[in-house]
Amino acid sequence: MKTYLVGGAVRDALLNIPVYDHDWVVVGATPQDMLEQGFSQVGKDFPVFLHPKTKEEYALARTERKSGQGYHGFEVSFDPTVTLEDDLIRRDLTINAMAQDAEGQIVDPYGGQQDLADKVLRHVSEAFAEDPLRVLRVARFAAKLSAFGFTLAPETAALMKSMSASGELSALTPERVWQEVVKALNTQTPSVFFEVLDHVNALSILFPALDALKGVQQPEKHHPEGDAWVHTMMVLDASAALSNDVSVRFAALVHDLGKGLTPKALWPKHHGHEKAGVPLVAALCQQYRVPKKIQIFAEKVTEYHGLIHRGLDLEGHPHLKTATFLKVLSACQAFKEVAQFESLLIACEADAKGRLGFESRPYPQKDFWLELAKRANAVDNQAILATGVKGAEIGEAIVQERMRLIEDFVREYSAI
């Protein structure tokens, strides 16, 4: 019975990336052997055990054989005769198919160290094509490791294209897709995830509303970077630089979906794309069972990012009507959820900076809207009640007072 550290922990250690999770493979053992040593079994489909002290996962070495569609369609075999090499060959990429023994020696039967040195993402074997989730996993690894200069091996890209063409991606469950999206959004350059999916023809299958942004022209004055797809990818990466919040990054990803609906005859303008995009965001969220809180936030960013930008004109002067300022503040729950409103403004800032030549420009709208919300929320409720208003009149009086406070602040801001 031998135990090996495997997978991501070995890869990340060789890349000098902090290792947070350790996965182990046990060769030459039975489930009974593990239980007798105090491990507790958690796996149903195949034996995975938790270490009695560290609670890290230890899996018996196993082989897999395709027996049906999707990533559930596998027959798993595990017994003491399964070798480490047998276990490693079923893994997705060569850089994930390395192990380390108890003495610290690297076991690398499939060239993972060479591919690490060459910065190549390469599949271990043709069995890669048996699991459609690997298309998403490899795209995610490309995003995670892009800062190190990793690229996709041409033969792996070709295999992923054939997987897209096979129809197997439709067998993926919404939860697994969303899980990979979240992991990709948490990388430094999440755009790479979607660009790889596009490269292997998976984007149009999994995210058609994003695919529809390709080639959609925008006003060159405001968007010298190119079409709505290029802009969206730049906004996504800008959001990653500004915030670690998945909600902000997801909102950045979907904020301009409405531009994909604009008739070509109206290009490069996209009047009303904000509101038009909301049903597309809702549909995507429902398709992949995105948590409701993230969906609602993304819908708010999608619907109101245009008005947030136009809160100040190009000279930095307040630009909306008082009633519109209040409408945006109320709709975005700026009075009740201050932290969430600030996150919404960060998503809008990413939108403004996700343009060629605008990456380092200040975004005064953020501080303006935060101060506007603070001022408009400084309503003296007791003073209003002291006037004797009752029932529905109280709400109306609060609205009028907020309008007055907004007007005062706008006047003050304009005089600066």
Swiss-Prot record:
Residues 228-335 form the HD domain. The lineage of its organism: Bacteria, Pseudomonadati, Pseudomonadota, Gammaproteobacteria, Thiotrichales. One of its GO terms (molecular function) is phosphatase activity. It catalyses: a tRNA precursor + 2 CTP + ATP = a tRNA with a 3' CCA end + 3 diphosphate; a tRNA with a 3' CCA end + 2 CTP + ATP = a tRNA with a 3' CCACCA end + 3 diphosphate. Monomer. Can also form homodimers and oligomers. This is Multifunctional CCA protein. ATP binds at residues 8, 11, 91, 137, 140. CTP binds at residues 8, 11, 91, 137, 140. GO terms for biological process: RNA repair; tRNA 3'-terminal CCA addition. InterPro entries: CCA_bact, HD/PDEase_dom, HD_domain, NT_sf, PolA_pol_head_dom, PolyA_RNA-bd, tRNA_CCA-adding_enzyme. Mg(2+) binds at residues 21, 23. A single active site specifically recognizes both ATP and CTP and is responsible for their addition. PANTHER family: MULTIFUNCTIONAL CCA PROTEIN (PTHR47545:SF1). Comprises two domains: an N-terminal domain containing the nucleotidyltransferase activity and a C-terminal HD domain associated with both phosphodiesterase and phosphatase activities. Its EC number is 2.7.7.72, 3.1.3.-, 3.1.4.-. Catalyzes the addition and repair of the essential 3'-terminal CCA sequence in tRNAs without using a nucleic acid template. Adds these three nucleotides in the order of C, C, and A to the tRNA nucleotide-73, using CTP and ATP as substrates and producing inorganic pyrophosphate. tRNA 3'-terminal CCA addition is required both for tRNA processing and repair. Also involved in tRNA surveillance by mediating tandem CCA addition to generate a CCACCA at the 3' terminus of unstable tRNAs. While stable tRNAs receive only 3'-terminal CCA, unstable tRNAs are marked with CCACCA and rapidly degraded. Belongs to the tRNA nucleotidyltransferase/poly(A) polymerase family. Bacterial CCA-adding enzyme type 1 subfamily. PROSITE patterns: HD (PS51831). Its cofactor is Mg(2+); Ni(2+). Keywords: ATP-binding, Hydrolase, Magnesium, Metal-binding, Multifunctional enzyme, Nickel, Nucleotide-binding, Nucleotidyltransferase, RNA repair, RNA-binding, Transferase, tRNA processing. Magnesium is required for nucleotidyltransferase activity. Nickel for phosphatase activity. The gene is cca. The keyword Glycoprotein does not apply.
